[in-house]
C-alpha cells in the first residue's frame, strides 16, 4: 500500500489529521487505478454519453438503452486481466460474475455474454495454451451454470501477450423500463449486504489489478461460485418486483470500501456501517480485511426499514444470506465502526473522488521506426501465402471455443456464434444485434485510426444482420 506524493498532499490538505489504518486501506483501494480511473478519467470524459435512446440515471454501472415498447437493454464490458494471467479459470470466471452483477444492479435480467480474449502464441508456448484453455473453461463454466448464453466473442494470439492474458467480458441485460432501479435513499434507510460471505479472497485485488504483474499473487484472485450468483439474480429480481430496493450496487473492486463510498457520493448521503454485522466466511478477519475483501457474489442494497422482513423472506426462500450492516445518514460521511469503536470517518466524496493524474505523454519511438510503405514483394507463392493465412490460429475456426458455451440456453439466440454478429430475440417482438470487436495491432501502429477501425468494424458487423447501431460500450486498455 503506497500513495503518490500528490495524493499525500491531497490527504493532508483535506483531512488535516493522521489517518487510521482502516482509512488508509480504504483510500488505497478506492484510489487505485483499477477503481478510480485516475489516469484515464479525463480522457474517457471525451466520449459521447448521451443520445436519443440513452437513459442516464445516478449510480448505474452499466449503459441503459431504450428499445421501445416500455423495455430497456443494459450493456457493460470490463476486463479481468491480472487475475486471469495468474489463475485463468477463476480469474475469467469471476470476470463473468462481476459484469453480470453490474447488469443486475440496474434492475435488469442478464440475458447474454460476450468475450474478447488475447493470449500468447499457442503454437509454441505451452503456458499460453494453458492460459487459453483454462480461461475459456472458466467463462464457459460460470455462464453455463447461470443459464446465460455466451453468444459471441473473439480470440487472438500474439507473442506480445507472452505470460499474460487479456480477458474482456461483456454482458447484456433486458427488462422493463418501469422496473429500473431509480437509485435514491432516505435518512434512516437500511444498508444491506446480500449474497456470498466475506472471506480473504481478493483482499488487495484492486491494487493488484493496478500494478505491473510481477508474481503470482493467487490470494488476490477471487473465488467464483456461480450457483450463489444464480440465486442472487433470482432473489434480487424478486425484491425488485416487490418494490423493496431503493438503491443497489455490486461489490466488485475494492469491496465494501468502494461500494459504500461510491453509493454515498452518487446519492449525496452519508452511510454508517458496522463491520461486525458483515456475514463472514472466516471468523478471524480483521476490520481492514472486511472492508477491502473482494469476495464475489455480493450485492449492496439500500431499502426502507419497512421492507426488511420481505427482503429477508425472499433471501431465505433462495437460501442466501442477508445482513443489515448499516444505515443512511444525512451528513454525507462514510462512517465505519467496529462495534462501538469508530475506525474510519471520512467525507464520502473525498473517498470516491480521488485526485486525478495528468501523466506525461509522448509519441512512442517505435512509431518512427515503422516502414512508410509495405515491404518488398514476398518470395512466397500465392498458394503458400493462402495456406499460411488459413493455418494461423487467428484465422482458423474458433469452433473449439464457442462449442464449450451453451449459446442456446434461454431460447433467445437467433443468430449464433461464428457469424458477423449475434442476434437475440427480445420480449417486445424486436431483435437485438450485438458484436464485440478489437484490433490491437492496428491500434499499436496508429492508435486513433485503430480505434476508429474497431468501432467501424463493429458497426458493419451489426449492419450485416439488418440492424441499426444505437449504442456502444468500450474498454480501452
Give the positions of each predicted feature.
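Glycine/proline-enriched, intrinsically flexible loops and inter-domain linkers
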Residues: 1-477
Amino acid at each position: 500500500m503506497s500513495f503518490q506524493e500528490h495524493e499525500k498532499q491531497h490527504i493532508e490538505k483535506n483531512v488535516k489529521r493522521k489517518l487510521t489504518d482502516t482509512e488508509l486501506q480504504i483510500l488505497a483501494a478506492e484510489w487505485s487505478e483499477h477503481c478510480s480511473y485516475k489516469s484515464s478519467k479525463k480522457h474517457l470524459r471525451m466520449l459521447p454519453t448521451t443520445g436519443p435512446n440513452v437513459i442516464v440515471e445516478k449510480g448505474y454501472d452499466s449503459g441503459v438503452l431504450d428499445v421501445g415498447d416500455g423495455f430497456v437493454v443494459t450493456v457493460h464490458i470490463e476486463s479481468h486481466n491480472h487475475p486471469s494471467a495468474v489463475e485463468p479459470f477463476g480469474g475469467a470466471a469471476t470476470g463473468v460474475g462481476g459484469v453480470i452483477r453490474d447488469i443486475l444492479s440496474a434492475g435488469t435480467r442478464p440475458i447474454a455474454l460476450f468475450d474478447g480474449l488475447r493470449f500468447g502464441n499457442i503454437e509454441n508456448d505451452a503456458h499460453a495454451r494453458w492460459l487459453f484453455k483454462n480461461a475459456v473453461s472458466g467463462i464457459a463454466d460460470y455462464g453455463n451454470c447461470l443459464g446465460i448464453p455466451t453468444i459471441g466473442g473473439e480470440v487472438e494470439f500474439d507473442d506480445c501477450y507472452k505470460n499474460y492474458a487479456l480477458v474482456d467480458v461483456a454482458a447484456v441485460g433486458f427488462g422493463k423500463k418501469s422496473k429500473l432501479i431509480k437509485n435514491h435513499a432516505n435518512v434512516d434507510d437500511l444498508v444491506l449486504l446480500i449474497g456470498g460471505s466475506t472471506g480473504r479472497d481478493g483482499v488487495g485485488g484492486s491494487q493488484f489489478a493496478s500494478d505491473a504483474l510481477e508474481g503470482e499473487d493467487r490470494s488476490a484472485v477471487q473465488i467464483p461460485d456461480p450457483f450463489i450468483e444464480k440465486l442472487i439474480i433470482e432473489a434480487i429480481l424478486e425484491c425488485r418486483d416487490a418494490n423493496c430496493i431503493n438503491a443497489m450496487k455490486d461489490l466488485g473492486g475494492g469491496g465494501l470500501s468502494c461500494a459504500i463510498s461510491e453509493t454515498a457520493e452518487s446519492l449525496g448521503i452519508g452511510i454508517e456501517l458496522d463491520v461486525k454485522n458483515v456475514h463472514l466466511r472466516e471468523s478471524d478477519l480483521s476490520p481492514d480485511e472486511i472492508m477491502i475483501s473482494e469476495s464475489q457474489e455480493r450485492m449492496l442494497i439500500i431499502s426502507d426499514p419497512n421492507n426488511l422482513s420481505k427482503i429477508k423472506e425472499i433471501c431465505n426462500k433462495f437460501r442466501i444470506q442477508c445482513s443489515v450492516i448499516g444505515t443512511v445518514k444525512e451528513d454525507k460521511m462514510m462512517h465505519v465502526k467496529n462495534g462501538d469503536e469508530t475506525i474510519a470517518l471520512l467525507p464520502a466524496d473525498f473517498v470516491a473522488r480521488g485526485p486525478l493524474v495528468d501523466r506525461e505523454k509522448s509519441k512512442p519511438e517505435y512509431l518512427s521506426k515503422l516502414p512508410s510503405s509495405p515491404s518488398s514483394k514476398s518470395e512466397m507463392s500465392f498458394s503458400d501465402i493462402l495456406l499460411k493465412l488459413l493455418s494461423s490460429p487467428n484465422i482458423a475456426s474458433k469452433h473449439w471455443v464457442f462449442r464449450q458455451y451453451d449459446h442456446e440456453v434461454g431460447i433467445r439466440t437467433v443468430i449464433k456464434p461464428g457469424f458477423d454478429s449475434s442476434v437475440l430475440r427480445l420480449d417486445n417482438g424486436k431483435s437485438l444485434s450485438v458484436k464485440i470487436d478489437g484490433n490491437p495491432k492496428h491500434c499499436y501502429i496508429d492508435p486513433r485510426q485503430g480505434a476508429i477501425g474497431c468501432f467501424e468494424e463493429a458497426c458493419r458487423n451489426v449492419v450485416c444482420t439488418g440492424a441499426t447501431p444505437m449504442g456502444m460500450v468500450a474498454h480501452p486498455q
